[in-house]
């Protein structure tokens, strides 16, 4: 069994797939409670973003969640005043941003990138009356601070479903004689060799192989969450290697547009990419942050405690699929997608069923979930039981960091 770095991570970055809005400075946006009627209660919420909504991916997806939660809370008589800080780096500027939002009177401060957590944790002890959230992170379950929280979603469920869509297209190409079975090769643009990315592309691959048994995958890591040029270059290189399907764990739309320019297919992440690649992009999946934001903000409004480590999936609509591009999807895809989604929701299908993959030719019988001593090697909590590896069961942040057969890593990037 090969164990690789099990540190979880997230997206975000300064690279843009579309031109940035020059009128939007780095830093705070004035408090905005939107057009909803004022409620009986008001919660002031700070949101620290590594990018802005112009990325059309990672940060844009957070803004979409923020807006949906605000609307839902208004219907409950809770008014939300948002103070948003854009384009904050994973450095001391994040510490400053947390301090500024705390001093501005925020009741709750949300940090949207993995690299923000160490800086958030420097600030949180000084403001015990304020709740601090680090999305996609992992320290709160053991940091001994009562006012810090982590949150993530079971995005591997959506990845698996996107893989099913990709696999059905590949099998159609085989059946129609467009490619031979051995040419059903997926190219995957990954950010870093972290557990979140590994978990994502492994679940995607398993979904594809469930309907296209001959599929294989090549993974190219770009060493950045958001570098539109490098993402495009990686997608182009993968297509040149013979990959006929491209997917991604990166923030921009350039893998989609590159796939279209290369005449291959694509599945996306964080946003519907059909608009930029209508002849290539089949579907995407994204985390829906609205249920968590609504839960956390409502708890603060009511003076109630809330989970320090929160994770849900399709069971609470925290993971959703983008629209299926039925113009290019294989026949029967919509029906198959609905069938498999119901199996995931009901628990009948386990994404990391250990009977569906091997590691160096052997079935996985044991794997630890948590790294308790900081050496990047899991050493606690058996994750394999009842015939499956149980991802995000012991903590919200992913910890599946195994290199399974059928997936070729072309490089590694640990940041």
For each feature predicted by the language model, list its residue ranges.
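Sec-dependent N-terminal signal peptides
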Residues: 1-2
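C-terminal motif of bacterial Sec signal peptides marking the signal peptidase cleavage site
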Residues: 6-9
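Bacterial signal peptide processing site
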Residues: 11-14
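A residue-level marker of the well-folded mature domains of exported/periplasmic proteins
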Residues: 17-415
